[in-house]
Amino acid sequence: SVLAKNNKVYVEKDAGIAIGFSNQAYIESGAEILGTAFDIYDGSELIVKVKEPLPEENKFLSSKNILFTYLHLAGNKENAKNLISTGVTGIAYETVTADDGSLPLLSPMSKIAGQISLVVGQYFLLKPNKGLGTLLGAIENVSAREVSVVGAGVAGTEAIKKGLRSGAHVNVLDISQNKLDELQRSFGTENISYILSNADSISNAISRSDLVIGSVYVVGKEAPKVITKEMLKVMKPGSVLVDISIDQGGCVETSKPTTH
């Protein structure tokens, strides 16, 4: 549709290789392949990418550009300041809201994050990774382990699904009773507990859990620190905490990003 309006479309060389799209596929669709990200920025008004600009990319941006990407600025004030200084107009995927209040561009990423949080959590529960050495699912003569999911939005709901499929007992904590009731209608009551979230209930749940998933999200704002440093002291040595909210600053007081 962009090409149909006599616009030019540039794609960075090899940008689609990892997802199965060759340079030739873009060429056949009418795009022109450029060698570097700088070439893309230099020749374009509208920049479409996946993640927020790296620090070295800010120098390529100016007031002539409209940047369309996942920005997650609430968790990175320095990046926000740098973007403002460029004069660029930024449109954040994660804040694009449909008429019904849903977040259609954030939802797919959240579903993936929720699923992966259980995979990563189980990996770090292994003894070689200094974990408890437990499997989440119940096996013969061994009781199921507990997983607590704090925040039952899209990512949290996917984590719940994955936890139940693994055979774990899942504690679901959310500030909305309506949300908890909705989830109970979906998941029933077997191997799952629905808990209204507050400081005491969070502390109690995470003290029993082998794995804790933090998935609290407030649109366009820094995630509230619902799991404090003091609460972490009640967790079992070797238990694991995965903070999905880290791209919005994290919902755990001590969380910090360790990868990009």
Task: Give residue ranges: language-model regions.
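Rossmann-fold NAD(P) dinucleotide-binding segment
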Residues: K49-G75, S203-L211, K221-L241
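Short glycine/serine/threonine-rich phosphate/pyrophosphate-binding segments
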Residues: V154-I160, L180, K221-V226, G249-E253
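Generic hydrophobic/aromatic pocket-lining and core-packing "Φ" positions
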Residues: N23, A80, L118, A159-I160, ...
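An N-terminal-biased, well-structured beta-alpha scaffold segment characteristic
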Residues: S1-N82, T86
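Residue-level detector of alpha-helix initiation sites
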Residues: E52, I112, G153-V154
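Glycine-rich phosphate/diphosphate-binding loop of Rossmann-like nucleotide-binding domains
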Residues: S1-F21, P128-G214
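Glycine/serine-rich phosphate-binding loop and adjoining beta1-alpha1 elements at the start
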Residues: P55-E146
